From Swiss-Prot:
InterPro entries: Arg_succ_lyase_C (IPR029419), Argininosuccinate_lyase (IPR009049), Fumarase/histidase_N (IPR024083), Fumarate_lyase_CS (IPR020557), Fumarate_lyase_fam (IPR000362), Fumarate_lyase_N (IPR022761), L-Aspartase-like (IPR008948). The gene is argH. This is Argininosuccinate lyase. It comes from Leptospira interrogans serogroup Icterohaemorrhagiae serovar Lai (strain 56601). SUPFAM superfamilies: L-aspartase-like (SSF48557). NCBIfam families: argH (TIGR00838).
Length: 470
């Protein structure tokens, strides 16, 4: 077989493809990942062709057996790739024809690579997306377990990267638990676009055969059939929506990594990462670097970039299919791999880190973290207007800063000079770190009672997710 004859479109051309066309047009270096989905779609298509009389039972059996052999060859590393065959779809069809001859050439009846490729990608998103969902649920499970263990650990809560108020560590961990629940639901929503059957749309106008697309939908386990063949082959909304979900997830993961980097630094020091998840320096022997967190933070930019790449590529394309769309898979494949390894890395860090509560206590005291509690004490117990209370406590903090003291060790005489209420057990209770968190009794707050309540709700949410996806 000559090179020209190997091309699926070779009949029209009198010259072989140039070297640069081969090099710039090949996609087998990355779209080989679609082999399972391509074979899955081809088997469904072959069964449909049998339904409408294009194939007989013997031919269908030959095709199914040969496709199963090709799948085995690919998985065992015995499949021979040829640079002139461009992509995984041509490779599989060429090998099929090698195995069963003319019968193999019938498989592409009523099918274009345009609808074939977009269908493969939709199936790939569904298959890989389920794995990402499992990883999200596993990460949520790790956050839940860590939160349960951290219920009695008090750490600083921050706004503007400055110490704000004491919180239970469980409150912090559960804040990411709920963010990841939204990511989980975003992926579920994104899957809907991939659950639409594109196969049967042909090149773009439909096909000249009485194909049974409802049959194909059921064979592939999809939920609906694309109502318009032009939209079916040209839309990449299924990839866009999936990458939007990946991007939101990676933004959350990157922010967790930023917290880990900060909180494990000498300046903060409220958590410690295990040695196995950190690295040293080639010149500075004292260093213990949170490389995994930094690398994941960096990888988040790649996923955001992949989404932007696809958005820019799509914005100026005319209807319907254009070869530019070959580039969509690079963005998709890279995002999937990046998300998966990032979820693994962040999970190990969460499971492995240790809180350092004594350092957290020092930070809370030095950061005047219970100043708001003191103001609320004046409002609730002494019936002082909040703005007046705010001013009194602000003055107290100013004196502490000037004298390099805290709310706990500033002499009573200095406190009384500001307010007669800044004395005795009432004052001590008002600024107490241990009591502060339990004063936050509003729903969703950081009091122990509300945290126990939230842990129960979180467990119910986790069980429901595991029931649906694991």
């Amino acid at each position: 077989m000559t090179e020209k004859e190997k091309k699926l479109w070779g009949g029209r051309f009198q010259e072989n493809a140039s070297s640069i066309l081969e090099r710039i047009g090949q996609s087998i270096s990355f779209d080989h990942k679609l082999y399972k989905e391509d074979i899955q779609g081809s088997i469904a298509h072959a069964r449909m062709l049998k339904q409408i009389g294009i194939l007989n039972s013997e031919e269908l059996s030959k095709i199914e057996i040969a496709l199963a052999q090709i799948k085995t060859e690919l998985e065992e590393g015995k499949f021979e790739f040829k640079s002139e065959l461009e992509d995984i779809h041509m490779h599989i069809e060429f090998r099929l024809t090698e195995l069963i001859g003319e019968t193999g050439k019938k498989l592409h009846t009523a099918r274009s690579r345009n609808d074939q490729v977009t269908q493969d990608v939709r199936l790939y998103i569904l298959n890989q997306g389920k794995e990402i969902l499992k990883s999200i649920i596993n990460l949520r499970s790790s956050l839940y377990q860590k939160a349960k263990q951290s219920l009695d650990v008090i750490i600083p809560g921050y706004t503007h990267l400055q110490i704000a108020q004491p919180i239970r560590a469980s409150q912090y961990l559960l804040s990411w638990f709920w963010a990841l629940e939204r990511d989980q639901e975003f992926f579920r929503f994104a899957f809907k676009a991939s659950e639409e059957l594109a196969l049967g749309s042909g090149a773009m106008a439909g096909v000249n055969y009485p194909t049974d697309r409802e049959f194909l939908k059921k064979e592939l386990g999809l939920s609906k059939v694309s109502p318009n063949s032009m939209d079916g082959v040209s839309s990449r909304d299924h990839i866009l929506e999936f990458l939007f979900a990946c991007t939101q997830l990676m933004i959350h993961v990157s922010r967790i990594c930023e917290d880990i980097i900060l909180y494990s630094s000498q300046e903060f020091g409220i958590l410690k990462l295990p040695d196995s998840l950190t690295t040293g320096s080639s010149i500075m022997p004292q260093k213990k670097n949170p490389d995994i967190a930094e690398l994941i933070r960096g990888k988040s930019g790649r996923v955001i970039g992949n989404l932007n790449h696809l958005l820019v590529m799509l914005k100026g394309l005319p209807s319907t299919y254009n070869r530019d769309l070959q580039e969509d898979k690079l963005a998709l494949f890279d995002s999937i791999e990046t998300v998966q390894i990032s979820l693994e890395g962040i999970r190990e860090m969460i499971e492995g880190w240790i809180w350092i509560p004594e350092r957290a206590e020092v930070s809370l005291k030095n950061g005047f973290a219970t100043a708001t509690d003191l103001a609320d004490f004046l409002v609730n117990e002494k019936k002082i207007p909040f703005r007046t209370a705010h001013e009194l406590v602000g003055t107290l903090v100013g004196v502490c800063v000037k004298q390099k003291k805290t709310l706990f060790d500033l002499p009573e005489s200095d406190r009384v000079s500001i307010s007669k209420y800044f004395v005795g057990k009432e004052y001590e209770d008002a600024v107490s770190l241990s009591l502060s968190a339990d004063k936050k009794i509003s729903y969703g707050g950081t009091s122990k009672k509300r945290q126990e309540e939230q842990l129960k709700i979180a467990l119910d949410s986790l069980k429901e997710a595991e029931r649906l996806f694991l």
